[in-house]
Amino acid sequence: MNILREHAQTIIDDTLKQVQPHAAVQRALEGCTFPGKCIVIAIGKAAWTMAKAASDLLGNTIDHGVVLTKYDHSQGEIPGFIIAEGGHPLVDENSIAGTEKILAAVENLSLIHI
């Protein structure tokens, strides 16, 4: 591999690492402080990975959380989280059930919780 190709590959590899959901969430939350416990809601194809990153970084700061992701995108349990999978790109009954779990998780929140 010539030197230009090596440099290009290094740039590509580093860029891809930076946009990975786990790394992006950890970068976004690093240094954040919360006055109390927080609730984490993660939705989408990368939701499980993002929630796991938040859990890894924030630990006991998280009171609870809900993940709603596409079928077969969950990689197992995350302590304190409800994991729900649903249809994508078409909504199905499990998508709706997952959305209801999210609504239940936040229904008693008010502006004081923000």
Task: Indicate residue ranges for each PLM-predicted region.
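N-terminal glycine-/serine-/threonine-rich phosphate-binding loop
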Residues: 1-39, 48-57, 71, 89-110
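Short glycine-rich or small-residue beta-strand-to-loop segments that form or flank ligand, phosphate
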Residues: 37-43, 83-86
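A glycine- and small-aliphatic-rich helix-loop capping segment at beta-alpha/alpha-beta transitions
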Residues: 53-64, 78-82
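Short internal beta-strands
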Residues: 65-70
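Glycine-rich, flexible beta-strand/loop modules in the N-terminal catalytic cores of phosphate-handling
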Residues: 71-91
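Conserved small/polar residues in nucleotide/adenosyl-binding loops
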Residues: 112-114
